[in-house]
Amino acid sequence: MNESMVTPYPLVDITPRVALVDKIRYPMAGMLSHQVSVGIYNPDTQKTVYLNTGDPTNRYFTNISWAPDGKSLYLIELNREQNHAKLCRYDSKTGELMSTLMEETHTKYVEPQHPILFLPWDHTLFIYQSQRDGYNHLYLYNTDGKLIRQLTRGECWCKRFWGSTPRRGK
């Protein structure tokens, strides 16, 4: 991550008896932000393949997860305003974008906090967590980006996914 263009910001640490000031790079609204690239390092070849994500400015990459077969990498690309998120799949050997599986937008912000979780018995299905209806819920998708069904619902928060067992015929 290249933060050299981000203005240093003083952060005051009040935990010691005499406060200390530490300058951190903090991307203030309306000012330049850091530039991020995502690389995959192969210890066998000792080479790094960088994902071809396009322009590295004004975007965040979060919730990175591997496909169970290791052939692709999934991540969420989030714009700087944090109101538009895209779940993307990249080829782990070439770094090329394979597909954009889904997009989420909101007038205020989207808050992706969890990587996708593949079902251990069916690697074409994964669980995605979203607050799209105002509450954090679980959604079942396939690797083509098709919503299969909403798994949890209601005026409550799904705070953690503990696991599941396969149902016969499903």
Predicted regions span which residues?
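Predominantly five- to eight-bladed beta-propeller fold
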Residues: 1-50
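Conserved beta-propeller blade repeats
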Residues: 22-37, 54-78, 84-92, 97-129, ...
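Short loop/turn segments that connect beta-strands within beta-propeller blades
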Residues: 42-46, 92-95, 142-146
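A structural motif specific to WD40 beta-propellers
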Residues: 49, 98-99, 148-149
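Ser/Thr-centric signal marking residues that sit
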Residues: 152
